[in-house]
Amino acid sequence: MRRFTATTCALALGAAGLIAVSAGTAQASTCSHARLPLPDSSCTPGAYNSDVTQSNIHSTICVSGWTATVRPPTSYTNPLKAQGIIDYGYSDTNMADYEEDHLVPLELGGAPRATGNLWPEPYSGSQTAHSKDGVETKLKNAVCAGTITLSAARSAIKNNWTTALQVTGIG
């Protein structure tokens, strides 16, 4: 898959401080942004952190501040974001206009460093990265309260975050 090869290059270049996204970048996109606000599932299928299970949620995701212990640094995510903007073929190449987001959020035990779980989610539009953040929090709160299972929350947000609250019955 080209995204992973390009991502590997982006990581190496980013670590060396050599990558930049600009309007002059002329590369063909490999991922589609036609389904926005959802990512292209062939490029961003989502991934789970195997260290988070239903049986340990009260010592992982339900602990305040836990996501900070697993969140990758921007030195890791910024090169991925830069390459993802190219891969998704976004016309706006300003990195500040995107969040390098986890499709399956860390709040629900998403894989922190899996490139297939990260994508440049726009801050613009009717359903944005900020909108998804609210969905993530509501799902995590429902999981921690025992209203829904971790598996149900993960599946719903991975399949379509815009309908996840309705699908799980908490929206």
PLM regions with names:
Residues 2-98, 107-171:
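Nuclease and nuclease-like effector domains acting on nucleic acids or nucleotide cofactors
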